[in-house]
Every structure is written in C-alpha cells, then in structure tokens.
C-alpha cells in the first residue's frame, strides 16, 4: 500500500531503491505517480519492472512509469511488441543515473550481444513510428468488443490498462482449463 511504502521509506533511511512491478501479469497498474513522489521525498530511486506495460506510453492517456516519475524502467518489448525473445528497453528518467545504468548493464550484459535481437528492436522502433498507433487502436477496440460479447458469460478484472484481458474464473465457478476450452471454440488460445 502507499501508506506502507511511505512509512518504510520515510522512517528507515536504509532503502536506496524501491523495485516494483507494474503493471502486473494481470494488467493491474500501481499508483506510480504517488509512489514516485514518496520515493523522491526520501531520496530513494524508483525502479519499475514494466515487462507487461511496454505499450503504456502509446495509450491516449500515457500511464508509462517513466511519464509518471519513475527513475528507471525496464520494458520487455518481446512480450507486447514484435521483438525477438529477450529484447527489451531500459529507460532512464534522471541523467544522474545514466552512468549507474551503464555500469549495471556492463555487469549483466554479454560480450557477445545478439545482433538478431538488436535488429528486431531497431525494426520494432520503425514499426512504432509508422504503424503502432493505428494497430493499437484496433486491438483495444477488439478487446472491448470481446469483453462486451462475453460480459454475461465471464467476469473480467478491472484494470486501467486496456490491453490485458484477465478472466476471473473463480467468480464463474469454472476452472482455467474449462475456460480455455470454451475460448478455443472461438479460435482464441490462451
């Protein structure tokens, strides 16, 4: 909770960074803006694992962690964009942390980077500039139609993030396998 983060960071001077995941696997988004304010009041770096939120920057309302005040944010591009597995972006929002980011990457990076992954990121950057916005509008519309079509049959988790479709099977008293079989009849694989 925001209160527990505030109590921990403002009372205890030992945390140097706060690492959170947002959105989570189910599309639930943390209040990054409020968390960033608390972190900055206590001189704590806010690092966000945005693995499932790579596209948040391109929504009508930008809720990408960097836009909301995170100091650093990692996007797993391969999860939501046409990028080879392992391709991702590290965004650094504070110039004071650029050298720290480069140093950390030198510890974890390979001396033999994958040029295929790097090329897929470059091609994806081109796609983002040329086609993503129109494709994103279409995908969001399709997700909304799907939610409407199945609103009486399934329960969906509420999320600020419109690109995740999370079925709450426990509310409909069915197993995930039952749901998968039902969706398969509509050519939907999950």
Cite the ranges covered by each PLM segment:
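Conserved PLP-enzyme active-site core in the AAT-like
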Residues: 1-156, 169, 174
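Conserved PLP-binding active-site segment of the aspartate aminotransferase-like
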Residues: 163-190
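Residues at beta-strand starts and edge strands
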Residues: 86, 161-163
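Short beta-strand
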Residues: 155-160, 190
